[in-house]
A protein has these predicted regions:
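Short intrinsically disordered, low-complexity coil segments enriched in acidic
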Residues: 1-4, 222
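Helix-loop-helix junctions that connect adjacent transmembrane helices in secondary transporters/permeases
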Residues: 39-120
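A short small-residue
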Residues: 1-2, 43-45, 163-174
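Alpha-helical support elements that line or immediately flank enzyme active sites
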Residues: 4-39, 61, 65, 100, ...
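Substrate-binding beta-hairpin/strand module that engages nucleic acids
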Residues: 151-165
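A glycine-rich phosphate-binding loop feature that marks nucleotide/adenosyl-phosphate handling sites
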Residues: 37-44, 79-95, 157-161, 198-221
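Short acidic, glycine/serine/threonine-rich loops at helix termini
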Residues: 47-50, 104, 133-136, 164-170, ...
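Short, surface-exposed charged micro-motifs
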Residues: 110-114, 145, 208-210
Length: 222
């Protein structure tokens, strides 16, 4: 069964929905893949409940890649005229899973960054590493936002609520997306503070300074 860590019951519901879609396509005499292409959300579709908008043609892209990977079309054509008690089949199932739980509930995350004397940073966030690799993703995001090497980012992976910033939890495919935004915003604030101080030391304009790979550089000549 799909619990809170595996899709919130979506696989069960989609099994029924996609099976029904196959039955409808068969009743209409339609190719099941082409019928799906007709009814999936097109580019520009806006969901009135979540207010999310589909900006990319990813449904058709994943169908194309999946069909190519398993040789779908060749198998589908070969299996059309089988006889006997044992037969082979090939199918297509497609669904969209939302990230996080908005607008059902408010989403938020928090982050704290500390700059060490050696130029490395410590990052604390309320989101929990439970084996899905989010600490690695957070370190990459923090490094990119601040402008330092990945190796100089230390994630404090101890979600003790006495000392850790607030976070809503590890569920609903939310951590990288929601937690990542708080890390990005905090990293940009830290970077701005570093460069503002660098302006005082170098007498350069703020627009001519950037933080790249852990070094403060002049934008004009690198």
């Amino acid at each position: 069964a799909a619990g809170a860590m595996r899709g919130y019951g979506i696989p069960q519901a989609m099994w029924a929905g996609e099976s029904h879609l196959d039955d409808v396509a068969k009743a209409l005499g339609r190719n099941p893949v082409e019928y799906r292409r007709q009814v999936v959300m097109p580019v520009g579709y806006r969901d009135e409940f979540s207010k999310n908008e589909n900006y990319f043609d990813t449904f058709n892209q994943v169908m194309d890649k999946g069909m190519e990977a398993i040789g779908y079309q060749e198998k589908w054509e070969a299996y059309q005229h089988q006889t006997g008690p044992v037969r082979r089949g090939v199918g297509m199932a497609l669904f969209w899973y939302n990230t996080a739980v908005w607008p059902i509930s408010l989403e938020s995350s928090s982050c704290r960054m500390v700059l060490n004397q050696d130029g490395s940073i410590q990052v604390q966030t309320g989101e929990t590493e439970i084996g899905q690799g989010c600490d690695t993703a957070y370190a990459q995001m923090a490094a990119d936002a601040v402008g330092i090497p990945f190796e100089d980012v230390h994630i404090v992976s101890t979600q003790d609520t006495d000392i850790t910033p607030f976070g809503l939890g590890a569920y609903a495919s939310r951590q990288t997306y929601i937690g990542g935004f708080s890390i990005r915003q905090t990293g940009q604030m830290l970077k701005e503070r570093i460069l503002t101080y660098a302006v005082e030391l170098t007498r350069q304009t703020r627009a001519n300074l950037d933080l790249i790979d852990g070094k403060i550089v002049r934008v004009s000549d690198g």
